[in-house]
């Protein structure tokens, strides 16, 4: 397919009577259009173009970007909040448990010497009576402190109830990330194929002088600047 610029050049050569130059230009255009590399590049361009169009109009991508990602962000914030609340409750309960445990430990240390004397048979009757009273007091203390410890441990256990709900939220976010990853891999695969094809044909393409980037597309009537124009161009080339 001859371009507008090439058609203008061909007409100009014919008007100037430069028949040989016109024939060479026509032969170049014809051979370029029937070049296998040209066809491969055209087909690859069509595939890439369609993939990009599908990427742009994919309603699922739009839904993910506008709805599910913001929703996932809010859900993760919720997980952070619930985790923070549970951590604070747990730490507060532990802080309340520590003095109780320390007090029990100190009481046991105070009674241990007399208890060792009793076990070794080296205790007087008066000390034995005193030991019995102290043990009775210790039992009462243990009874009260153990009840308090049980309450604090229950508080710690209840603070962990967030895990079931937050676990479900995290799994949902992971599924969303996996879906986004899958769709991005599909897009990258298309680009990867384009790059591989470009490298394979690099030596051949080097023999064709490139026109270079279009620096003033608004002034060029042969430049494409929209999706519809790309479609029309590819269709006119037979792809």
Swiss-Prot record:
An individual GO BP term: archaeal or bacterial-type flagellum-dependent cell motility
Keyword ATP-binding: no
Keyword ATP-binding attributed: no
E.C. no: 3.1.3.-
Disulfide-bonded cysteines: none
Localization per record: Cytoplasm
Pfam family, one: CheZ
Family named by the database record: Belongs to the CheZ family.
Name under which the protein is recorded: Protein phosphatase CheZ
Organism: Vibrio cholerae serotype O1 (strain ATCC 39541 / Classical Ogawa 395 / O395)
